[in-house]
Amino acid sequence: MDQQVRVLWSRLLHLRSSAAALAAAPGILVVAERHSRLVRLDPQTGVPLWEQNVEDCWGTTVVAGDRCLYLSQAGVLHCFDVHSGQRTWSTPKLCLCHYIIVAGSVAFLSGWRGYRPLIRVDLTSGELFPGQLPGSAPGGSLAWPLPVRLDPERSYTAGAVLLASASEAALLLVDALTGVTRGEWSLPEPVRFPDSGVAFSAGEDGRIVFLSGRRTVMVLHPASGVEILWRHDRDLRSLPPILSGRTLWLTEDTGVTTIDLDRSSRTAVMHLPPGATGEGVPVSGDALFARAGNQLIAVNRAGEIAARVRLPARIDRLLPDGRSLVHAIGKGHLTTIDISTTPT
């Protein structure tokens, strides 16, 4: 099978929005732009569907079911109906928060690099839950929390969240409603993550892959615990590995390596364009990586470049929509790419 990577459309955001100001779900795309607008766009065409005024375009956007949340840099958390754009509630005085994830009926907020402890907000009312969660003491660098589906056989996501700190060699799974610890796992070294805080890559089968230290790739399945998948022979970039089936994609400073876990064999991707490799995302059984020079490359399981395309601006973040689209935001541009697979 061959990958086809095609640019569908590109939109000028007029200001350099935060990379976290973009959120996507199947059939849904929302971005903060033009200093003070939150806009829902048609993912296929880029046509605006609704817009609302917010405080800035440097905050964090999340889509969760029928809700869209926007946490402004000014410290106001807004909740909108994702279909109509109607504002449901707004909660102020949440300064120094940056991370948002939703688990069940609860939104988790935390400060970038742990500048503010993890807090919980009721999605129905916007009210804060009392108390402080375990593992959320201020002063420690916290990875972006991850909602965890405890029962992959069910269609809904159970209300639990995975926590990791740059200073503790452990993972913590916390119940969203009660704050009670549901699981705790020791690691060889603390979870390693970049300045953005994104540490985990979650697969559809419930496996969560991450770096423990600079060279060890590990996987967590909440039902069975953690295990070491691969020990690399040199330092990896502080970016989440990608795991699909029994294939790993690892990001090094200037290159990409694929690992066949069944054979314990590795393949360095050849003929890469010059420059650094950025984050990657899984696409149709392969992996898509941002490269210096505004380039995207699709790398297959054999370690071959299956497709490449150049975008209008530098790529700060890639965000799949859960179907065949990938959205790229960076340097004042939003670009949507269609990833299709064709028989060879």
Tell where the protein language model's regions lie, with residue ranges.
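Secretory-pathway ectodomains
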Residues: 1-344
